Each structure stands twice: as C-alpha cells, then as structure tokens.
Amino acid sequence: EAETATKSCSGRQANQVSLPKQPASQPRGDPTGPKESKKKVETETETDPVN
C-alpha cells in the first residue's frame, strides 16, 4: 500500500507536467486544456434554458 501512495504522488506530478503538453500534441482536443473545457460546459449549461 505504501508503494501505491508513493506512485500516486509521482503520478500526480507527472500528470501536471503532461497536462499542458497533451493538448499541444492532440490538436483534436481543446488546446486550452480541460479547465477551459469545463468552464465552457458550465457556461453552456447556464445559457441553456432547457437545462
């Protein structure tokens, strides 16, 4: 279990470094990143009167 905890910490740091690199490598995705994507969804939901 201790190994898993250490791996989680390392994975988190690697993810933070990979995040900005991923959108640049994947043009089909949002180049702004997942954070911007979430904001977009929130705005769309607020603007949608059906929702």
Swiss-Prot record:
Compositionally biased residues, Polar residues: 1-25
Cellular location(s): Host nucleus, Host nucleolus; Host cytoplasm; Secreted
Record's keyword terms, sorted: Acetylation, Activator, AIDS, Apoptosis, Host cytoplasm, Host nucleus, Host-virus interaction, Isopeptide bond, Metal-binding, Methylation, Phosphoprotein, RNA-binding, Secreted, Transcription, Transcription regulation, Ubl conjugation, Zinc
Motif Cell attachment site per record, residues: 28-30
Basic and acidic residues biased stretches: 33-43
Residues covered by region (Disordered): 1-51
Cystine crosslinks: none
GO molecular function: metal ion binding; RNA binding
Crosslinked residue numbers (Glycyl lysine isopeptide (Lys-Gly) (interchain with G-Cter in ubiquitin)): 21
PTM comment: Acetylation by EP300, CREBBP, GCN5L2/GCN5 and PCAF regulates the transactivation activity of Tat. Phosphorylated by EIF2AK2 on serine and threonine residues adjacent to the basic region important for TAR RNA binding and function. Phosphorylation of Tat by EIF2AK2 is dependent on the prior activation of EIF2AK2 by dsRNA.
Superkingdom per UniProt: Viruses
Primary localisation category: host cell
GO (cellular component) term, any one: host cell nucleolus
Further comment found in the protein's record: HIV-1 lineages are divided in three main groups, M (for Major), O (for Outlier), and N (for New, or Non-M, Non-O). The vast majority of strains found worldwide belong to the group M. Group O seems to be endemic to and largely confined to Cameroon and neighboring countries in West Central Africa, where these viruses represent a small minority of HIV-1 strains. The group N is represented by a limited number of isolates from Cameroonian persons. The group M is further subdivided in 9 clades or subtypes (A to D, F to H, J and K).
Family membership: Belongs to the lentiviruses Tat family.
Domains (record comment): The transactivation domain mediates the interaction with CCNT1, GCN5L2, and MDM2.
Assembly with partners or alone: Interacts with host CCNT1. Associates with the P-TEFb complex composed at least of Tat, P-TEFb (CDK9 and CCNT1), TAR RNA, RNA Pol II. Recruits the HATs CREBBP, TAF1/TFIID, EP300, PCAF and GCN5L2. Interacts with host KAT5/Tip60; this interaction targets the latter to degradation. Interacts with the host deacetylase SIRT1. Interacts with host capping enzyme RNGTT; this interaction stimulates RNGTT. Binds to host KDR, and to the host integrins ITGAV/ITGB3 and ITGA5/ITGB1. Interacts with host KPNB1/importin beta-1 without previous binding to KPNA1/importin alpha-1. Interacts with EIF2AK2.
Function: Transcriptional activator that increases RNA Pol II processivity, thereby increasing the level of full-length viral transcripts. Recognizes a hairpin structure at the 5'-LTR of the nascent viral mRNAs referred to as the transactivation responsive RNA element (TAR) and recruits the cyclin T1-CDK9 complex (P-TEFb complex) that will in turn hyperphosphorylate the RNA polymerase II to allow efficient elongation. The CDK9 component of P-TEFb and other Tat-activated kinases hyperphosphorylate the C-terminus of RNA Pol II that becomes stabilized and much more processive.
Name of the protein in its database record: Protein Tat
